[in-house]
Amino acid sequence: MAKRDYYEVLGLDKSASAQDIKRAYRKLARQYHPDINQEADAADKFKEIGEAYEVLSDEQKRAQYDRFGFEGANQFGGGGDFQGGFGDIFDMFFGGGGRRQDPNAPRRGEDYQYVVDLDFMESVTGKTETIELEIEVECDTCMGSGAKPGTKPETCNRCGGSGVETVEQNTILGRMVNQRPCSQCHGSGKTIKEKCPTCHGSGHVKKKQTVEVKIPAGIDNGQQIRLSGKGGPGVNGGPAGDLYVVVRVRAHEIFERVDQHIAMDMPITFAQAALGAEIEVPTVHGNVSLKVPAGTQTGSKFRLRGKGMPSVRGGANGDQYVSVIVMTPKNMTDRQKELLREFEEISGESGVEEEHGMFQKMKKFFSH
């Protein structure tokens, strides 16, 4: 049977965040765990869910899968048979290693992700971006306990505060004893009789927060900035998560970034190429003069040192590489044609292919 798309398996689309992927896996793995779900195909579905999570939860594997599909994922050992045991889902919930995690122990908050779109020139100069986020913060009414002021959470009388309950099942292999999240306290180890009227027992409320992000000059498409402690609130006094700002840089009409360097095509006239000329070339740092020697051919490259992208680490700028395109004249007068034929007779030179309308792009750029 053909494999299903990993995003489809988890019920997500390709824009899903790491948190979305983790939440979807937890929900589905709990639903189809063979020790809980007795349907005939539960084990196969659990295996499929685990395989999808193994690839999509790894940034490198996910990038390869997004680009090349299953073959790309296989390059990094993913996309094959899921090797996780049936106990793995409980390890995820309770810490693994044969020991359950204390549900009352401090836990770090979730990381958040935010995408910022920049123009190409903004990535050159850097900028300060103000972003508005809706994040979860500790409820001021109950101070994060989830209980009505004047009351407090109580130890769950079903699991005794452990957060798990023991379930016995009759299977073809005999009676099996398994542990699962407590059905009464949902793994927290506590119950709340009178919930906080503000947060309704969650201990957190959503709040809009403005964050200033300093984007350094020279940042590249896909790079991210980490803001420590700006993510989701911690649990039971644990530290807050982090905010990751992912930068997307829009393409430029003329410039193309190659690592820390910039490449561009520069059209020149037939006469400039043949006789040589001093031309004005645009760079991200302003226009500069470039001497084109006589006899320059299409494809000739010139290097402008230090005219590339700044370094985000504060080092030297990259360079700019200029590729010359010799433009074939068109709409010539009779006199021009006559002189060109005379030139051809003298030199035996043949015509060159016409290039596309680069002059229009350059004209537009210089007019800004």
Swiss-Prot record:
PROSITE patterns, sorted: DNAJ_1, DNAJ_2, ZF_CR
Amino-acid positions noted as binding Zn(2+) 2 in the UniProt annotation, renumbered to this chain: C156, C159, C182, C185
Names of the cofactor(s): Zn(2+)
Keyword terms of this UniProt record: Chaperone, Cytoplasm, DNA replication, Metal-binding, Repeat, Stress response, Zinc, Zinc-finger
GO MF annotation list: ATP binding; heat shock protein binding; unfolded protein binding; zinc ion binding
Record-linked InterPro entries: DnaJ (IPR012724), DnaJ_C (IPR002939), DnaJ_domain (IPR001623), DnaJ_domain_CS (IPR018253), HSP40/DnaJ_pept-bd (IPR008971), HSP_DnaJ_Cys-rich_dom (IPR001305), HSP_DnaJ_Cys-rich_dom_sf (IPR036410), J_dom_sf (IPR036869)
Span of zinc fingers (CR-type): 126-208
Protein role: Participates actively in the response to hyperosmotic and heat shock by preventing the aggregation of stress-denatured proteins and by disaggregating proteins, also in an autonomous, DnaK-independent fashion. Unfolded proteins bind initially to DnaJ; upon interaction with the DnaJ-bound protein, DnaK hydrolyzes its bound ATP, resulting in the formation of a stable complex. GrpE releases ADP from DnaK; ATP binding to DnaK triggers the release of the substrate protein, thus completing the reaction cycle.
The protein, known as: Chaperone protein DnaJ
Species for this entry: Exiguobacterium sp. (strain ATCC BAA-1283 / AT1b)
Lineage: Bacteria, Bacillati, Bacillota, Bacilli, Bacillales
